Amino acid sequence: MNDPNSCVDNATVCSGASCVVPESNFNNILSVVLSTVLTILLALVMFSMGCNVEIKKFLGHIKRPWGICVGFLCQFGIMPLTGFILSVAFDILPLQAVVVLIIGCCPGGTASNILAYWVDGDMDLSVSMTTCSTLLALGMMPLCLLIYTKMWVDSGSIVIPYDNIGTSLVSLVVPVSIGMFVNHKWPQKAKIILKIGSIAGAILIVLIAVVGGILYQSAWIIAPKLWIIGTIFPVAGYSLGFLLARIAGLPWYRCRTVAFETGMQNTQLCSTIVQLSFTPEELNVVFTFPLIYSIFQLAFAAIFLGFYVAYKKCHGKNKAEIPESKENGTEPESSFYKANGGFQPDEK
């Protein structure tokens, strides 16, 4: 019979009944392997998304950046303010409030480009918004955090990982640029790549959520208030982004694009900032909130996508669509949707 007071076999230091067991590095190894694989897959998916971006229209958004400006206001105006209001309203701990605000100040995530495709959004606007928000985050993140977190913490204690932001920018711009080139040179082949990549992108989004749940199982042990904020925050981002875009006079398909670009945050960047800025003891309180936000932003995105697909099947073909005026050097097109091919059968 085993002595209950004896040390376990793999203990490295024993003193009576006190033992030090080496920590398992399985999660660390799994995290590195999966991060590498997911990064490669994400680059391939973004390459396929680039195959739906037209150079002329993309440059049109850069030259006449009304849509990008609306997205900028949503990304670095609405989201940080919403995070601040939620933190004050729920009276959460200062550390928790800071993490909620970090989420709100992050640029848009690349998953928004995949979802914009599936809801027949404006891919040219989606890619240009993600690129610009990531680039502008170099200056806007420190500014927003300085404004909103000073009532809880010294803003100088929050570390902005500029190298990670730069890496995110490169991993977005390079594959998308190659995809744009393929679409320009070989449009028929680009359509095939796009079909495959869009399906792979949907699978990748689910895979990221599952992997996050495996690696950070402690995420389910978190303050109830953070669960509620993690539920409300992405919905508020999607809704307010859509509303502001509509008030600004953007057509419906661009409103959907802005909505996803607003609510879909770069939670990986947020996790990196949190890890660099807080002690291990503080991380126990706050580290899992980015994962909670990520889960709910994907869950509600899937729900909104389902509603859109159902609406499109019931009303899309019968809707009296108002042509959009010529803009950005493009021909007039429907203001309701601009079919990307997502959930749409090929014509016989």
Curated annotation (Swiss-Prot):
The record marks N328 as: Not glycosylated. Its main location: membrane. Keywords: Disease variant, Glycoprotein, Ion transport, Lipid transport, Membrane, Phosphoprotein, Sodium, Sodium transport, Symport, Transmembrane, Transmembrane helix, Transport. GO terms for biological process: bile acid and bile salt transport; response to bacterium. The modification Phosphoserine is found at S335. It is found in: Membrane. The keyword Transmembrane applies. It is a multi-pass membrane protein. Plays a critical role in the sodium-dependent reabsorption of bile acids from the lumen of the small intestine. Transports various bile acids, unconjugated or conjugated, such as cholate and taurocholate. Also responsible for bile acid transport in the renal proximal tubules, a salvage mechanism that helps conserve bile acids. Works collaboratively with the Na(+)-taurocholate cotransporting polypeptide (NTCP), the organic solute transporter (OST), and the bile salt export pump (BSEP), to ensure efficacious biological recycling of bile acids during enterohepatic circulation. PANTHER family: ILEAL SODIUM_BILE ACID COTRANSPORTER, SODIUM-BILE ACID COTRANSPORTER. This is Ileal sodium/bile acid cotransporter. It comes from Homo sapiens.
